[in-house]
Amino acid sequence: MKNIRNFSIIAHIDHGKSTLADRIIQECGSVSDRELGKQMMDTMDIEKERGITIKAQSVRLDYVKDGEHYILNLIDTPGHVDFSYEVSKSLASSDGALLIVDAAQGVEAQTIANVYLAMENNLTLIPVINKIDLPAADPTKVAEEIETSIGIDATDAVLVSAKTGVGIRALIDAIVDRIPAPVGDSNAPTKAIIYDSWFDPYLGALGLVRVFDGEIKVNQLVKIMSNGEEHQVLDLMYPHPLKRKKTPVIKTGEIGIVVLGLKEVHVVNVGDTITDAKNPTCEPVVEYEPAKPFVFAGIYPIDTDEFENLRDALDKLRLNDSSLSFQPETSLALGFGFRVGFLGMLHMEVVKERLEREFNLDLIASAPSVIYKVYLNNGEEIHVHNPSELPEVNRIDRIEEPYIKATVITPSEYLGNIITLLINKRGTQTKMTYLNQDRVMLEYEVPMNEIVMDFYDKLKSISKGYASFDYEPIEFRVGDLVKLDIKVAGEAVDALSIVVPRNQALPRGRVLVKNMKEIIPRQLFEVAVQASLGSQVIARETVKSMGKNVTAKCYGGDITRKRKLLEKQKEGKKRMKSIGKVQLPQEAFMSVLKMD
């Protein structure tokens, strides 16, 4: 056990951690140069295209130093804020972490968030300054930033370039020398944490585990602690870079894959503890709490016959993504679909993209919203995920909305505009720190609802892409909120309802109906687009009707003939207007997001 090293890699997006992981794999000789695919650790197409890590991956490597043989278990983690739940579980199964910072860009907001998670798990941190081959690299300045913002000693930071391979061997030696070996009692009852799970079409649900005490053997009867279910271990494997290698036992301190042959991945939940069924351990590795969704959106198939296929697709995605939650819902405008809960905006985009790509579905997504706690006059408390479900105004005593603590790190030249953006989003400043003369760290408390719309895009455009952002939920607070309904041709479209602060209802209503007017195709009758609070209409635009020349086929002749045709058309349009349905294009549902 003394020669095992379990370590994670934590970094902000684009600071080069997947490339660095590939270099470490290559340096350990686990993969030949020919087999080394770009980003071995990112297996999904979306991950490779977007250059982000979504699912935490793991790999077991062999390394020889001074004639001694070491086993390095590398646990790659996602860097994006939405996937911090995955990060926290990966860190719980590690003994140390490489903190990677880009030598040109410096410390970013998500780096700090993940460092705090690592500190909570008492991990040994090795600061690594990557991309030292870049012309703009300034390792000394970045080392100072690490000390200022995080407060850890960066004098012995390892300087590497994952692209050129400089400093990789020194880094692996540092891992062996500085990260502690795992501690655990090999004679105690089995105790292992599941830090990742996914679905394999041949083997069923697989759990990636780190064993803290005891060992797991093939054919052992194990118990999952959160739900008490018992299952037999059918197979055990080590995650090697290119293929999994079977093993009869996973010992204390090791990581491995457990095959339980289950059809449902919900049984194998990330963060849960596995123990021996006959001789269980007393307490779990960490208290299991399921990942909580923060952002909700309706997802509907464009073709209503695809509803069952969408259900199957969501079920299959949930096999690999335990944080995804969904329930069926119906919308008058969009038919049958699902209300899906996501960890954040990127998670929502990725899920929608995977549904469309991997399952060939055409989908419409409604605007995202958050959970509201609504207290009624009779003392009842209800949780509303969908703005269209908000009760009538006269029944509501008060509405509470979730607030988050937002951390923004930005070059100081964009500070003024970013503060204006945060104030417009109803944010209140709690802290401001200068990391050095060029970069500032801001902390604000902001309603979550303001973040899910378009905050991230605006932040990036104001700062030309240089500002970074991270958030954590804090609490629910009372807000003066109202439901803004959009009516098209006199009918409220439930999928377009949004919850807004009362003082913003009028400007937002005006912008929305104006956007909708541009998007709705012209009909043979005129269409009124209205924004309303309850029964009161606060804004209106009209989509003009198309003209059709019904008199074209009359040559000369009597005016009464033409008049008769025009009257007939007028009647037809009147009837059409009363029973006509307006087909709304997908852009209409996303126009809610564009509030400018």
Curated annotation (Swiss-Prot):
It is a peripheral membrane protein. Residues 2-183 form the tr-type G domain. GO terms for molecular function: GTP binding; GTPase activity; ribosome binding; translation elongation factor activity. It catalyses: GTP + H2O = GDP + phosphate + H(+). GO terms for biological process: positive regulation of translation. GTP binds at D14, H15, G16, K17, S18, T19, N130, K131, I132, D133. Its main location: membrane. HAMAP family: LepA. NCBIfam families: lepA, small_GTP. This is Elongation factor 4.
